[in-house]
Amino acid sequence: MSPVAGAKFVRTPLQLYRYLLRCCRLLPSEAMQKHYQHAIRQSYNSHVDEDDPQRIQMIIQRAISDADWILNKYTKKK
């Protein structure tokens, strides 16, 4: 289950971009937030010209699962 509501509704690269930026707000420190926001922007810009629908869906699924993993890693109670 995704930590941020709406992951199942992500269908386009722009929706993914917005979803991932919302996920960043859940990270514990501002430095982490800035780091991952920068990484998200870089990745978005590097894939902006992708036009294969299957490849786009693969990227979306992978990005959501990676975001879930990162949020679980940093927000897990010890």
From Swiss-Prot:
Its name, as the record gives it, is LYR motif-containing protein 9
Query: Pfam families per the record?
Result: Complex1_LYR
Matching PANTHER family: LYR MOTIF-CONTAINING PROTEIN 9
**Can you list the disulfide-bonded cysteine pairs?**
none
Task: Name the family the entry cites.
Answer: Belongs to the complex I LYR family. LYRM9 subfamily.
